[in-house]
């Protein structure tokens, strides 16, 4: 199931050489934890969206660990919002370990009120 109805969307290529996002996925039954490291921006957000699309049908809990996320853009926020909407009625979604800069973006955009933050 695609988050936004786009089943064939391919991850964007890293053209800038500056944007990088490492995504590690840990699975425990139907609970998934995504550990994000780097930048979640226009270049890298399709990669996260694709990985979330792979698991959202089976997931009962989705945790995004942002302890090593340096930056998040509006494109990254869109992917997080899509994940939240996809998990609605299926299970829980938790965002944890926000860095100061990411926490400030969440506060400014109102995302702090939308997500279960640990």
Residue ranges and their predicted role:
Residues 1-14:
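N-terminal leader/presequence segments that are low-structure
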Residues 11-48:
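STAS-typified acidic loop motif
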Residues 42-115:
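Amphipathic alpha-helical interaction surfaces in cytosolic regulatory modules
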Residues 118:
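Conserved catalytic-core motifs of GNAT/GCN5-like acyltransferases
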């Amino acid at each position: 199931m695609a988050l936004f109805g786009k089943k064939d969307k391919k991850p964007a290529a890293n053209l800038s050489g500056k944007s990088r996002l490492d995504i590690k996925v840990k699975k425990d039954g139907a609970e998934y934890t995504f550990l994000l490291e780097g930048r979640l921006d226009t270049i890298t957000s399709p990669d996260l969206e694709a990985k979330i699309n792979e698991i959202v049908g089976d997931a009962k809990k989705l945790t995004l660990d942002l302890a090593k996320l340096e930056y998040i853009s509006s494109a990254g926020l869109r992917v997080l919002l899509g994940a939240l909407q996809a998990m609605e009625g299926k299970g829980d979604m938790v965002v944890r370990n926000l860095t100061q800069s990411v926490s400030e973006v969440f506060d400014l955009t109102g995302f702090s009120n939308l997500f279960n933050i640990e």
